[in-house]
């Protein structure tokens, strides 16, 4: 038998090697394509779901706080007790998966090639809510205790209108003598028209001073003496340790030493700069102011200063959170506020809206953009003006400072979806 040429014998082996190499390349290409598409699907599916859900929960929490405020205003307007509930925690587990399958038939010879590609993705969430009824002695005391003067100063310092903060937070102005003795009270209540009108005029006057950069709203700062006359020389360790604690040693003219620390005192509203006073005068003024509770903001408009044509000395008495809600609710039907003209027509300033915070009560739903709650067959919503929306924002801030951190709740209500 004749021997075949070597080239003819090697042809099947070469073709088989080529087929195996081609199959290997095709499988590697399919695996690479499958992995790339799967990663792409996972990357596109997960982050948008997480973003939407986190922002969605945040928006729902904000709306709940708004509705809770309006709900309690509606309750008080109907002579019903207030009640607060807080969503103390929201925990959600997110799960997203992506699948990709590829199969087919690829022929080396001429013909039709078949390729099937299956792509799938899914996302799920399992939220758990903890709803805590806000109650107890501690919270009741916070709701019924007047706000401190530092809260009032914070709102004004952040750029808020002082007349807006006063109308919302203040129960009135206590006029006092220079030694702090009581003279009379100017109540911020439309049921006392003359006092209410005078209060509004004083608030507008303070706003005019503030608009013209002639009103100072700040805490008193002064050096508090801890050791008045230290006869020895303090050691280097005492000086360094004191410096780290905000203490300062200072040598007196007689050679002895004095130990002081910088202290922030009570808040003052005045038409003069408290820093222009001496350190001893600021300390003495703080001692005088401390005779009033922390819910009083010291007020001193001197006759010889800017705006001295309407002098007054006393204190702005702040409301509690419950008193603020009651004031707004009473203004809906029982004692609505009325328009007041400035006491001094020459002072061009915005006296503000007629109502501190106007709450509209309607039978039909208002604009969806407005904070609204449905209660007892009516819709309670914030009036659609810049003034009312700003006042409601201030009220929301005060509400958050009142609630604080929810702790030691006896029976939280947990809902798992």
Task: Label each region the model flagged.
Residues 3-4, 11:
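Low-complexity, intrinsically disordered or signal/transmembrane-proximal segments
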Residues 17, 21, 26-30:
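N-terminal export leaders
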Residues 34-37:
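Classical Sec-dependent N-terminal signal peptides that target proteins to the secretory pathway
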Residues 40-43:
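C-terminal motif of bacterial Sec signal peptides marking the signal peptidase cleavage site
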Residues 45-417:
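N-terminal amphipathic/basic membrane-interacting segments and domains
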